[in-house]
């Protein structure tokens, strides 16, 4: 689907955020949002600013595919987001996105210490890029 897609890597301290280009081809990192009472409002502002067509939220399933406490927290947060934004909200499996993001940052010469501030949004980029690639494949 053409248009800007937003993606969130939900966390208890920070929420990593990424957006796509208007063609829905490339994921681009945005500044992470501090988790807390204002997070949903901040995300709603980004939906408006970028005229997003949807919001993709990472669902942190366990490696066996089952849902644990983190997945339940992400589901609850996604439900709250859906009540605030006027676009579809979709939960997408995010297993290993943070690992992939850490690996990419390490290969770019970033240490764990210097990656801390950007890892959440880097994970959101991995999540969104995977989503965009899957959407393109299904459109073929």
Segments (PLM) and residue ranges:
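Phosphate- and other anionic-substrate recognition elements at nucleic-acid/protein interfaces
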Residues: 1-8, 12-140
């Amino acid at each position: 689907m053409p248009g800007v897609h937003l993606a969130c890597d939900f966390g208890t301290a920070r929420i990593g955020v990424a957006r796509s280009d208007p063609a829905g081809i490339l994921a681009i990192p945005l500044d992470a949002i501090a988790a807390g009472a204002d997070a949903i409002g901040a995300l709603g502002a980004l939906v408006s600013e970028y005229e997003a067509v949807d919001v993709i939220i990472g669902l942190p399933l366990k490696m066996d595919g089952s849902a644990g406490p983190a997945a339940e927290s992400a589901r609850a947060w996604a439900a709250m987001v859906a009540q605030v934004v006027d676009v579809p909200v979709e939960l997408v499996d995010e297993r290993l996105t943070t690992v992939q993001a850490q690996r990419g940052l390490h290969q770019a010469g970033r240490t764990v210490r210097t990656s801390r501030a950007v890892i959440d949004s880097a994970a959101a980029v991995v999540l969104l890029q995977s989503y965009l690639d899957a959407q393109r494949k299904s459109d073929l």
